[in-house]
Amino acid sequence: MPTLDDTDRAILHALQQNAKESYSTIAQSLEVSEGTIRFRIRKMLNAGIFDFIVHTDPKKIGLDVQAIIGINTRLGQQQHVALQLQTFEAVRFVGAFSGNHDLMIQAYFSTNDDLVSFINVDLAALEGILDVDVNVELMQYKDSFSY
């Protein structure tokens, strides 16, 4: 993986503020050539350092229920369960953690009934799950992709 210098970090910061910013505007603000910006962005894209994605607001597309679900698995079944969880459209994030749960997932649903069905039907059918701990978001204070 290439090492990022101050210019690379400044480019990333500019894109995080406005991913549609023109290369010429970024170049002017950083006092470098537009070619430098184009080259650096292409290099970082090819290295997988970042990607351009569409970020949607779940609530504005009808996904009003967000749940963070802790999952405990049978010994030796963590990866098997994680791979199955990845296949569900509602599941946005799957990660293995230390602490009280083997896996944590973030999932979005249109209604509470959809969440209940996911737990009682979909998760209940998965081999290797011992128990789940469901936490429903009541209020969101921050959701950012910037680092």
Question: What residues fall within each predicted segment?
Answer:
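A compositional/biophysical signature of low hydrophobicity enriched in polar/charged and small residues
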Residues: 1-147
